[in-house]
Amino acid sequence: LKPNQSRYWLNPNITDEASFHQEVHQVCEVYEVYEAAPALYENGIHVHSTDEMTGIQALSHKHEALPMVPGKVERREFEYERHGTSGLIASRHVVTGQIESPLIQPTRTELDFVQHVREVVLLHPEYQHIFITNQLNTHQSESLVRFVIDRGKLGLDEETIGVKGKSGILKSLATRKAFLENLAHLIRFVYTPKHCSWLNQIECWFSILVRRLLNKRSSFSSKEALEERIAQFIVYYNTHLAKPFKWTFDGKLLKV
């Protein structure tokens, strides 16, 4: 027993059995896509794990750290200066482990997300694509629906597409989500259930980014310097470290 230690825990709040079973099905679907990713890749279908990392702070220590000496650990300046924040929209190719088309900037609007998805698709424009992501509203937007229609050359008329909040595919978040999940599309989305960010492999890579670059030892003199360092780290990671994660379902963390 370690009474001095504790950890957060989220108890399930099951108010609707049907919705609960639907979310369980979603977990299984995401898992099945990960398992099938190598075979899908062989058949020209690319699987991407996609999300945003927001509020990345550009902090600089007021003074340089004092190096370790015999008998003393390294001493880092406690006070720091803020130089703004940025963000990152990124996809991780599930089979190759490569970080694809990172969008490093402060904003994360629905148009930003569509821009990122477009750039990822254009890396392999002749193939099909599956994006695993969460149910954020910008991931189920009108702009994304229209991109999938245009890119997939679905040839839908405006009456079928409808008007946001009123009719057709665009009527509601639910109708847009159903359209984006359509198995027949060249570009489709698989959504993780609420409180299941652990299912999204890009979250594990964000943790790598924090440990390797955005840690307490880091110091960034400006927002631009922060963004440049993130871009450089991604290039280094793709060149030297990228590999598929080994998925485990026995309570252990994903292993690189």
Where on the chain are the PLM-derived regions?
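Mobile genetic element proteins and their domesticated derivatives, centered on retroelements
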Residues: 49-51, 91, 97, 117, ...
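Short catalytic/ligand-binding loop motif for oxyanion handling, primarily in non-cytosolic enzymes
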Residues: 56-58, 138-142, 197-201, 254-256
